[in-house]
């Protein structure tokens, strides 16, 4: 399967998109523009939606993107903006699927939604940990038939807010929106020495619904809970989201 790749940057939204036909790039850009407009207009009238670190209630008549982010915030007990990157990845892939795209991978700062017709490996990036670039998650094609979310939060890498010190907290869910908010929430509990911090994260993960599993890396230590894809060895030193192999 040949993939076409393009980086799409519109204001703060920076997407790495891989698709099986370049015609889908324009559709993805239109999705970003339209959904950003919906979100920005709502935030202009309701600035608390942008700044809150706690869940925010919204009325029934809000744009779908606002509703989805708010629901994810309540599910993980974080502010709605904790789900923003995963939300754009998911909405892009959903729109492409509706337009008969068979293979699409949307990555937004480590927050991924993908739908592939073949088994696919997504590489792990966990900062300076020795596990970074040496492990990957092998997803079965059946898992991705309607799209699947893999989202990562880090307290040591990137500009996103995390109150913990995990090198990576990767969450797996049918929804990248749910996974993104959950990764942020779980990552906030990565406090203390490595083993204790990992246990704190896994205990928090037990209380979050709608997720399949979680994989946490702090330094040379790792832990998991729930069902995660098969771990395989990889030698690619690349950012999570940049390592995609169809097998």
Swiss-Prot record:
Matching Gene3D superfamilies: ApbE-like domains
Highest taxon of source: Archaea
UniProt family annotation: Belongs to the UPF0280 family.
Protein name: UPF0280 protein MmarC6_1437
Gene source species: Methanococcus maripaludis (strain C6 / ATCC BAA-1332)
